[in-house]
Curated annotation (Swiss-Prot):
GO terms for cellular component: cytosol. Pathway: Cofactor biosynthesis; molybdopterin biosynthesis. PANTHER family: MOLYBDENUM COFACTOR BIOSYNTHESIS PROTEIN B (PTHR43232:SF2). This is Molybdenum cofactor biosynthesis protein B. The lineage of its organism: Bacteria, Pseudomonadati, Pseudomonadota, Gammaproteobacteria, Enterobacterales. It comes from Escherichia coli (strain K12).
Length: 170
């Protein structure tokens, strides 16, 4: 088990929206993640939108992994079953370790909301160069489910018995 802090420690977060249709003005899921992270006390240090292309996704995420400024990457979109949904294929080669439990718990929670449609979600998470990366579906409702029930509690250094803080770059 990890050591747990008695005070809130903000993390440095980058947000990536994967979409061929969304622009900054109508990026509702990206805006939700940004606003929620900031309201929780975290620092959103960058935000970007890339097309549904595994190499564009990988390039942007790789830059953040290499940066000392980013500890956590939140990705919305690109996790479904269509040909354009390539986030898992872009990310899995980058992971030093996959966090299998994220996808499992996300689909369990989603099942309560959308039933068997959750089978089409390929939400993934992993750690690369001490950067924690979460990829979730593009709907704002799915982002809310992931943020409120999984990500936010695990980014809080006060969460017991363990949280992700000991695994992040300083």
């Amino acid at each position: 088990m990890s050591q747990v802090s008695t005070e809130f420690i903000p993390t440095r977060i980058a947000i990536l929206t994967v979409s061929n249709r969304r622009g900054e003005e109508d990026d509702t899921s990206g805006h939700y993640l940004r606003d929620s992270a900031q309201e929780a006390g975290h620092h959103v240090v960058d935000k970007a939108i890339v097309k549904e292309n595994r190499y564009a996704i990988r390039a942007q995420v790789s830059a953040w992994i290499a940066s000392d400024d980013v500890q956590v990457v939140l990705i919305t979109g690109g996790t479904g079953l269509t040909e354009g949904d390539q986030a898992p294929e872009a990310l899995l080669p980058l992971f030093d370790r996959e966090v299998e439990g994220f996808g499992e718990v996300f689909r369990m929670l989603s099942f309560e909301e959308i039933g068997t449609s959750t089978l089409q979600s390929r939400a993934v998470a992993g750690v690369a160069n001490k950067t924690l990366i979460f990829a979730m579906p593009g709907s704002t409702k799915a982002c809310r489910t992931a943020w409120e029930n999984i990500i936010a509690p695990q980014l809080d250094a006060r969460t017991r018995p363990c949280n992700f803080h000991p695994h992040l770059k300083k």
